[in-house]
UniProtKB/Swiss-Prot annotation:
Catalyzes the NADPH-dependent reduction of N-acetyl-5-glutamyl phosphate to yield N-acetyl-L-glutamate 5-semialdehyde. GO terms for cellular component: cytoplasm. This is N-acetyl-gamma-glutamyl-phosphate reductase. InterPro entries: AGPR_AS, AGPR_type-1, NAD(P)-bd_dom_sf, NAGSA_dehydrogenase, Semialdehyde_DH_NAD-bd. One of its GO terms (molecular function) is NAD binding. The active site is at 155. The gene is argC. Belongs to the NAGSA dehydrogenase family. Type 1 subfamily. SUPFAM superfamilies: Glyceraldehyde-3-phosphate dehydrogenase-like, C-terminal domain, NAD(P)-binding Rossmann-fold domains. The lineage of its organism: Bacteria, Pseudomonadati, Pseudomonadota, Gammaproteobacteria, Alteromonadales. Pathway: Amino-acid biosynthesis; L-arginine biosynthesis; N(2)-acetyl-L-ornithine from L-glutamate: step 3/4. It is found in: Cytoplasm. It is an enzyme of class 1 (oxidoreductase). It comes from Shewanella sediminis (strain HAW-EB3). PANTHER family: N-ACETYL-GAMMA-GLUTAMYL-PHOSPHATE REDUCTASE, CHLOROPLASTIC-RELATED, N-ACETYL-GAMMA-GLUTAMYL-PHOSPHATE REDUCTASE, CHLOROPLASTIC-RELATED-RELATED.
């Protein structure tokens, strides 16, 4: 049985991964941690999330003694923390010999030049960054199994890349256009005016400047036009993607490309049928639906996931299972 420490357990993603690990008979939770300055330190997790009343663990402050205890007792650490916090914590635990599963964006780019623009900091851990692998579970399982530094993908990139990677060989130079809508849990647990009950509404944000755009482009190997939207629902993502395929591409080619997921238990693919968010909420699944126009060679593919599950916590759990080979 592997022991896992969870840092940032008070947030939506941290609480979700706590629930998944708690239910996994092959894993045990070494401890749940929050910042020393957190107002939630010392509280039982169930005080914040009554639905987790079966998890009798409290949130401990991540002091220096706690960090050393993690090194002594845990096999791996899950970081559900802010990018700038994960930057340092991931490197520290990695250098102490633990396997790190980082849910932030601090290790998703291999190029250090990307970080000042997209994350607002200079990346000072090139040695750790060079060992990091991108944890897109269905595509990078061999790397996840062998690495001790796993950067779990963002929610929008997970939905988009799962849809686009199978057809990469058929893409033209035209940029895929990705329009995606996420539930408000994607904005985090802290109170914000634009996510409050009376203010939240369907609206685009981060237009031509969202940090998930270069993440998608890097992993796809092609630039994309990505426009995220905030939806007035709690959780889930629906990404609708329009791409033009090469002139010689056929409907049979597309069907054959998506057959790569035939043995992927969490991915469902349907032709001429499109997914809805309600079918994937509270599950680790991704539902894909596609339609191809043989005259224009345009393909429209829709991808639905739960942003807190397949877009974060359950994909981290997948990576843990892949890494520890069970």
């Amino acid at each position: 049985m592997k022991s896992i420490a969870i840092i940032g357990a008070s947030g939506y993603t941290g609480a979700q991964i706590t629930s998944l690990i708690n239910a996994d008979e092959n894993l045990m939770i070494q401890g749940l941690y929050v910042s020393e300055n957190s107002l939630d330190k010392g509280k039982p997790l169930s005080d914040l999330y009554p639905s987790y009343s079966h998890i009798s663990l409290s949130l401990s402050p991540l002091c220096d003694d706690a960090k050393m205890l993690i090194v002594e007792q845990a096999d791996a650490v899950v970081l559900a923390t802010d990018h700038a916090v994960s930057l340092h914590l991931a490197a520290w635990f990695y250098q102490k010999g633990l396997t790190v599963f980082d849910l932030s964006g601090a290790y998703r780019f291999s190029d250090v030049e990307q970080y000042p623009k997209w994350y607002g900091f200079n990346h000072e851990y090139q040695d750790v960054l060079s060992d990091a692998v991108y944890g897109l579970a269905e595509w990078n399982s061999e790397q996840i199994a062998s690495s001790k530094m796993i950067a779990v993908p963002g929610c929008y990139p997970t939905a988009s890349l799962t849809a686009l990677k199978p057809i990469g060989m058929f893409l033209t130079d035209a940029f895929p256009v990705i329009n995606a809508v996420s539930g408000v849990t994607g904005a985090g647990r802290k109170a914000q005016l634009h996510t409050s009950f009376c203010e939240v509404s369907l609206t685009p944000y981060g237009v031509l400047g969202h940090r998930h755009q270069p993440e998608i482009a890097t992993q796809l190997g092609q630039e994309v036009i990505f426009t995220p939207h905030l939806g007035n629902f709690k959780r889930g993502i629906l990404a609708t993607i329009t791409v033009q395929l090469k002139p010689e591409s056929t409907e049979a080619d597309v069907a054959a490309a998506y057959a790569v997921y035939d043995d992927a238990p969490l991915i469902t693919v349907k032709q001429n049928q499109f997914p809805k968010v309600d079918d994937v909420v509270n599950t680790p699944n991704c539902h894909l639906g596609w339609k191809f126009d043989p005259e224009t060679h345009y393909l429209v593919v829709a991808s639905a996931i739960d942003n807190l599950m397949k877009g974060a916590a359950s994909q981290a759990h997948q990576c843990i299972r892949i890494h520890f080979n069970y």
